[in-house]
Every structure is written in structure tokens, then in C-alpha cells.
């Protein structure tokens, strides 16, 4: 059922995007950038990450709007994170945030990576490194929650359980 919904959403997005491209005033370059972005999203949703990255990189070459660039960079970060390249993923999330500081999903994903790295360090008995990563995770989750207080419930619970949420920090 979920796959059907995802496909319906993808098809709906594609139809709407085509309509918007025809009716909204946009330069040829903007339209081309958006087409690459759209193809990148389609490839990403079907799991073709190499194709998605190719399209996103082409979109980045053409897209000038910082807000739109932030979402392209965010999606590139998602792909690298899904492939386990957390260093590149973090780099692209930070680039996205440099252009658009109001991306709670990027903040959340950064926190998830730091939490994962903290867990791995803890398993290796590298407790100081683990604590540092958990502190970073807490910091990014707090920022994400401030932007989207009704989201990231698991993160809010983790912050409370671990004592990383002070009594004055209520969302």
C-alpha cells in the first residue's frame, strides 16, 4: 500500500511540476534545473542513486536560487547517508543549512548520524568519543525540534531520557 501511495505522489508531483513549468515565469536555465531536480527525485525514489546524483549535480550547476539549491544539496546528503558515506552526507547537509537554516529534516539527519556514530563508538568502548557524538546529536535535535516542535518525538524522548534536555528547554 505504501509503495502505491509513493508512486501516486511521485506521479502527481511530476504532473504538477510539468504544469508549473509551463505556467510560471521562469528562465530557460531555471526550467532546466528544475527538470534535472525532478528527474533526480524520481530516480532517488526508485532507488537509482547514481542516476539521482547525476541529475542533482546537473541541477546544482544551473540552479541559482539559494532556497532551491538547499533542497538539492539536502537530497544529495540523503543519498550519501543511505549509502553509508556519513562524512559526505554531513558535508552536504551543512551546505544545505548554510543556504537555508530552516531545514529541520537536515538538522534531524545530522543528529541521527551523530547518534549512530556515538552508538558505534560506545560499542568499541570509546566512551569520550561516544559522549562527544551524543552531545552533537542532542544539539542538532534541539535545533530541529525548535523548528518543527510537533515532529521528532523519538528524539524528544531520547533527549528527556538521557538528561540532555534541561527543564528550561520545553518545545
Curated annotation (Swiss-Prot):
Domain of life the protein comes from? Eukaryota
The UniProt entry, under SMART domains, shows: TPR
The membrane topology of this protein is: Peripheral membrane protein
- Record InterPro entries: PSI_Ycf3_assembly, TPR-like_helical_dom_sf, TPR_rpt, Ycf3/AcsC/BcsC/TPR_MFPF
- Which is one Pfam family of this protein? TPR_8
Q: Which GO terms describe its biological process?
A: photosynthesis
Question: What are the TPR repeat spans here?
Answer: 33-66, 70-103, 118-151
Keywords on this record? Chloroplast, Membrane, Photosynthesis, Plastid, Repeat, Thylakoid, TPR repeat
> Which Gene3D superfamilies does the UniProt record give?
Tetratricopeptide repeat domain
**Cellular compartments annotated:** Plastid, Chloroplast thylakoid membrane
Q: Does the keyword Thylakoid apply?
A: yes
Q: Which GO terms describe its cellular component?
A: chloroplast thylakoid membrane
Record's function text:
Essential for the assembly of the photosystem I (PSI) complex. May act as a chaperone-like factor to guide the assembly of the PSI subunits.
Q: Which family does it belong to?
A: Belongs to the Ycf3 family.
Q: What is this protein called?
A: Photosystem I assembly protein Ycf3
Originating species: Emiliania huxleyi
Amino acid at each position: 500500500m505504501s509503495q502505491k501511495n509513493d508512486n501516486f505522489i511521485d506521479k502527481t508531483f511530476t504532473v504538477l511540476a510539468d504544469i508549473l513549468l509551463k505556467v510560471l515565469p521562469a528562465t530557460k536555465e531555471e526550467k532546466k534545473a528544475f527538470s534535472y531536480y525532478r528527474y533526480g527525485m524520481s530516480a532517488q525514489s526508485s532507488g537509482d542513486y547514481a542516476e539521482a546524483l547525476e541529475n542533482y549535480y546537473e541541477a546544482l550547476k544551473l540552479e541559482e536560487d539559494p532556497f532551491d539549491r538547499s533542497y538539492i544539496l539536502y537530497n544529495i546528503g540523503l543519498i550519501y547517508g543511505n549509502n553509508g558515506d556519513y562524512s559526505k552526507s554531513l558535508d552536504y547537509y551543512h551546505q544545505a543549512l548554510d543556504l537555508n537554516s530552516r531545514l529541520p529534516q537536515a538538522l534531524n539527519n545530522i543528529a541521527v548520524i551523530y547518534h549512530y556514530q556515538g552508538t558505534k563508538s560506545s560499542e568499541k568502548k570509546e566512551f569520550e568519543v561516544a559522549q562527544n557524538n551524543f552531545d552533537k546529536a542532542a544539539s542538532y535535535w534541539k535545533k530541529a525540534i525548535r523548528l518543527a516542535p510537533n515532529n521528532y518525538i523519538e528524539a524528544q524522548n531520547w533527549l528527556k531520557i538521557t538528561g540532555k534536555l534541561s527543564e528550561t528547554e520545553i518545545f
